[in-house]
Design a protein with these regions (language model features):
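Active-site lining segments that contact anionic ligands and/or coordinate catalytic metals
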Residues: 164-166
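Conserved two-lobed SF2 helicase motor
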Residues: 168-171
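His/Asp/Glu-rich metal-coordinating catalytic cores
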Residues: 3-4, 8-162, 176-187
């Protein structure tokens, strides 16, 4: 039949909205295959910069195939750093004296941290809704990715007791999914 083939994996740190994202290089007898997964180049990322030196070294060694995925790769220019999002939140929060509702991917712990930090700065409580958002919040806090000041988080069931100008709701449903937390929020007119 065929002969055995030894494959050795090498993991390379990349930036993405998900913490600890990696690309990997598979060394085979016929050449190296690099799979990036979705990534962006962010020089100020919370979890460290993409390992361009390691990717460059692989390129110098020779790569048989590069399997690359990067959202908006066809657009010219650069993808802004996740840190720029906090500035956008600050601008929006500073001009708002009503309840703020924000949707985001539940898996983006860095964005959730930005929201929590800015909400605290503006004296607002944060309630999260959506099962995946609640799960990510719990796990990311346990793993140390999220630093949540005491007294900042409130249970979604307690939001009617908080003045609108002191509340931020972070919800799943940023892509308009039926039955997402955002969709359900819209049905009860909170």
């Amino acid at each position: 039949m065929g002969s055995e083939m030894c494959i050795r994996d090498r993991f390379i740190h990349v930036n993405h909205s998900i913490a600890d994202a990696v690309a990997f290089a598979i060394k085979t007898p016929v050449g190296t295959v690099v799979m990036t997964g979705d990534f962006k180049i962010d020089t100020t990322a919370e979890d460290g910069m993409i390992d361009l030196a390691r990717l460059g070294a692989l390129g110098k060694e020779g790569v048989l195939a590069l399997l690359c995925d990067s959202t908006n790769v066809e657009r010219q220019g650069y993808t802004p750093s996740e840190r720029t999002v906090a500035g956008s939140f600050e601008r929006q929060f500073s001009g708002c004296n009503k309840r703020i509702i924000v949707t985001t991917f539940a898996s983006n712990a860095f964005r959730l941290q930005s929201l929590i930090t800015v909400a605290k700065k503006f004296g607002r409580k944060v309630a999260v809704t959506g099962r995946s958002m609640e799960n990510i919040l719990k796990v990311s806090t346990e793993l140390g990715y999220l630093k949540i000041p005491a007294g900042t988080l409130v249970d979604i069931n307690q939001i009617k007791q908080i003045p609108n100008n002191k509340l931020v709701i972070v919800s799943t449903g940023s892509q308009g999914e039926n039955m997402s937390a955002l969709y359900r929020l819209s049905l009860i007119h909170i």
